[in-house]
UniProtKB/Swiss-Prot annotation:
CDD domains: MMAA-like. InterPro entries: GTPase/Isobutyryl-CoA_mutase, GTPase_ArgK, P-loop_NTPase. Belongs to the SIMIBI class G3E GTPase family. ArgK/MeaB subfamily. Keywords: ATP-binding, Chaperone, GTP-binding, Hydrolase, Nucleotide-binding. Transmembrane segments: none annotated. GTP binds at residues 53-61, 201, 257-259. This is Putative GTPase AF_1289. It comes from the Archaea. May have GTPase activity. May also bind and hydrolyze ATP. May function as chaperone.
Length: 346
């Protein structure tokens, strides 16, 4: 299919066209850029909600129950679940249907036109997201979903990248996994707009909740010191980026028992309240402006790297580097000069 045919189908509500567009984008087919160009002006209406947390905290069940709750509220829901990639194929290991086990009415939900589910492989990428997550979010947005839920891979590494695609970041924890370690690790004190203590029927839930509320009450200087001690995303914490992005908003802490549906309504309420707050204060425009800037720089960098590989003698310079005949800085300058020179030739 031609890009314009896919876009026409997607914008008219054709789910097959949406699925094909996602496949093109995820696999970086040549047509994908034209698809993204054509749908860009149709985006910016959906509320993108990211759920992140360590393995086993129940993110998938929360996503399932939240989907049910938002559907009850008349919202159309798109779901992106980032799976760990196969080290051999790069493909998602879990697959779409396994991720919806927590839903009560599976048959109905699989045929519900107001729900679309897609799993994506992280392909070994750190940060909890797949490389093309942002583009797939835009496709779901253009299709007309009201809420887009993005569930990170949950591999235990720093997953602060969720803030690069989400309007609202939900950090999920659970008891009996070392509450202080959970709270101190991976910059999660800085990235969350909402915090969830799931599996709250287990012992220790109140302790996690108290500790979390205490840590969230600390001032910016204290958290910056904490980030140094815990090896969080220190550069971004020290820059004040995380605090600036939620200034004026006090993150709530919500206890849930997702597999029984307890606390789901309160969580959905908090998610909607946060979205309303951002729209009212102008924070949503600020976050999205930063997101577009990062995206622009990433596209430029990818295109420049492609030019370097195609239009310069970087391989010869690599050989010289390995022989000690030049240094990385001089080699980089030569590559930049080559790129500029070749660009001037048209």
């Amino acid at each position: 299919m031609k890009p314009e045919e896919i876009v026409e189908g997607l914008l008219s509500g054709n789910r097959r066209a949406l699925a094909r567009a996602i496949t093109y984008v995820e696999n970086e087919y040549p047509e994908s850029k034209e698809i993204m160009r054509q749908i860009f002006a149709k985006t910016g209406r959906a509320h993108v909600v990211g759920l992140t947390g360590f393995p086993g905290v129940g993110k998938s069940t929360l996503v399932s129950k939240l989907t049910e709750e938002f559907r009850r509220r008349g919202k159309k829901v798109g779901i992106i679940a980032i799976d760990p990639g196969s080290p051999f194929t790069g493909g998602a290991l879990l697959g779409d249907r396994l991720r919806l086990d927590g839903m009560d009415s599976r048959k109905q939900l699989w045929t519900d036109p107001g729900i679309f589910f897609r799993s994506m492989s992280s392909r070994g990428r750190a940060g909890g997201l797949a490389a093309k997550t942002g583009d797939v979010v835009r496709l779901l947005d253009a299709f007309g979903f009201d809420v887009i839920l993005v569930e990170t891979v949950g591999a235990g590494q720093s997953e602060v990248d969720i803030i690069e695609v989400a309007d609202t970041s939900v950090v999920v924890m659970m008891p009996e996994t070392g509450d202080e370690i959970q709270v101190n690790k991976a910059g999660i004190l800085e990235i969350g707009d909402i915090y969830v203590v799931n599996k709250a029927d287990l012992g220790g839930a109140e302790k996690v909740e108290r500790w979390l509320r205490y840590m969230l009450s600390l001032d910016e200087e204290s958290v910056q010191m904490l980030s140094q001690m815990t090896h969080a995303d220190e550069a971004r914490v020290q820059s004040g980026e995380f605090f600036e992005r939620r200034k004026g908003w006090n993150p709530p802490v919500i206890k849930t028992v997702a597999d029984r549906g307890e606390g789901i309504k309160e969580l959905a309420d908090a998610i909607e309240e946060h979205f309303d707050y951002m729209k009212k204060t102008g924070l949503i425009e600020k976050r999205r402006r930063e997101r577009v800037k990062r995206e622009l720089f990433e596209i430029v960098m990818n295109d420049v790297i492609k030019l370097v590989k195609e239009k310069t003698n970087y391989r010869d310079l690599l050989v010289k580097l390995l022989k000690g005949e030049t240094d990385p800085y001089t080699a980089a300058e030569q590559i930049v000069e080559e790129v500029i020179h070749n660009a001037g030739k048209g």
